[in-house]
Amino acid sequence: MKYFEFGKENEELMVLLHGGGTSYLGVLPTAKKIAEKYHVVLLAYDGFNPSEPETEFQSLAYEAQGLEDYLIENYGGKVDILYGLSYGCRTLMQVLEDNRLEITTTIADGMSLRDYPDIKSDFWKEVYLFFFTGTFFVIMGRAGKLRKRFLAKITGRSFEEADRILYTKASWKSWKNQDKCLIGKKTDYSVFENTDMHIWYGIKGTVDKKLSANLEELKAKGYPFTCKIFEDMGHGGLIGENTERFIEEVNAVHPQSKGKTEKRV
């Protein structure tokens, strides 16, 4: 894994976690713009980093542990804003489990509210990965123009954005490991109590509509979080092609989070 940092002269630290099947390049333009106000740490996952093509994605826990240790060693574990997009939300949830960290504001953008199936048999795990992961590997991992147009349609993004953010050189092993490590893992939503939690969905396409299908059920369980739906945005559309709007939304929630943190202290 690799960490790209921008705006080190700024006081507040913002950590960005990009989605699966993409590279850090998808959010790089926004990261650089945000760096005018925040000190930005952008994580590039092993196996999905164009600058380290020889690496393989091992597991979500491995990526999260590396990030946690990096933040503790370099910044004392204090994070002002933690942002995750899509698969990055799963990394984000893992990071929130680390009690060594102090995270003020957390934003999960396009977060799936469904767990992977609990499959015990190694044989059936491989069968599941062959069909489930294999489908996404073909559509996203080796996408040509037609598949990118399809992805743009279902995510509510433009073709140009789909073409820019997809990383088509990751290995099958990296793709498989992304999902394999999550089979049987239950999401612990109680970690919402460790931060001021915000969940965003851009429902212009069909992807976030499906990802948010269990939203009302989650609300009913009483976990502390706020949710905002962007009807005019696609999956990841804010951080992707609407940089100014993204910054506005972040700046709107973070000061409130700081106020809540001060009251807790």
Name what the model sees in each region.
Residues 83-92:
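Gly/Ala-rich beta-loop-alpha elbow adjacent to hydrolase catalytic centers
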Residues 177-215:
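Conserved serine/cysteine hydrolase catalytic core
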Residues 1-14, 36-38, 146, 255-265:
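Alpha/beta-hydrolase fold catalytic core
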Residues 4-52:
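Conserved HGGG/HGGXW glycine-rich cap/lid loop of the alpha/beta-hydrolase fold
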Residues 97, 103-135:
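Flexible "cap/lid" loop of the alpha/beta hydrolase fold
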Residues 118, 137-191:
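Conserved alpha/beta-hydrolase catalytic His-Asp/Glu region
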Residues 42-83:
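Active-site loop/oxyanion-hole signature of alpha/beta-hydrolase fold enzymes
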Residues 233-242:
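Catalytic histidine-centered segment of alpha/beta-hydrolase-like enzymes
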